[in-house]
């Protein structure tokens, strides 16, 4: 990364933290809670970048295996919907960007056991969504800017692979490590892409050199 790009990235992160810090003064700060013994319904906010979104897939499979019949609603960007909308065990796959009426109606009408934000750092968009969603327990990865509007703050190790960090929620429900790689079957149906069951996933947006 060039010095100019590094400075721009630092400025962007500082700006984002300032916005989220300000939102924390406006939004209701939540008390700490315990995770429920079982999860019957959950809403998950998927990250914006394509690589980060794909790396969420093993977590989704493990979540559905751990809680058969769980109602999973997933929020993502419009350009990432194709990754998730064909997964049979996802009840609703809706885009939060651009903001739209279907998404607004969903987050205002549903009551979830758990809201899960697996993003390791602050996001003003995710903060706004979290504040609007009705959930008994709101869960994030530990971050001083995120924590005020969440009930549960999971370990957030920036030296772990992102896919492993995503699964911190399931570590509280007996998930054994390492997690199992998984892609939906339709990934193998794309022409001239993945032709067999063995694959390598590269995350080009890793935020730490150890990843």
In which residue ranges do the predicted regions lie?
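Catalytic machinery of carbohydrate-active enzymes
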Residues: 1-211
């Amino acid at each position: 990364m060039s010095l100019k790009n590094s400075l721009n990235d630092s400025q962007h992160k500082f700006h984002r933290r300032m916005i989220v810090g300000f939102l924390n003064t406006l939004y209701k700060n939540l008390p700490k809670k315990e995770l429920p013994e079982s999860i019957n319904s959950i809403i998950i906010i998927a990250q914006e970048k394509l690589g980060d979104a794909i790396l969420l897939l093993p977590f989704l499979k493990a979540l559905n295996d751990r809680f058969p019949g769980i109602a999973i609603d997933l929020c993502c960007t419009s350009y990432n919907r194709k990754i998730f909308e064909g997964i049979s065990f996802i009840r609703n796959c809706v885009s939060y960007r651009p903001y739209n009426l279907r998404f607004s109606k969903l987050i205002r009408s549903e009551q979830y056991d758990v809201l899960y934000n697996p993003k390791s750092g602050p996001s003003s968009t995710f903060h706004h969504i979290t504040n609007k969603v009705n959930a008994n327990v709101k869960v994030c990865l530990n971050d001083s800017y995120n924590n005020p509007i969440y009930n549960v703050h999971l370990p957030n190790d920036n030296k772990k692979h992102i896919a492993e960090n995503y699964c911190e929620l399931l570590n509280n429900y007996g998930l054994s490590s390492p997690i199992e790689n998984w892609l939906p079957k339709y990934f193998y149906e794309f022409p001239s892409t993945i032709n067999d069951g063995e694959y390598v996933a590269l995350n080009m947006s890793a935020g730490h050199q150890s990843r």
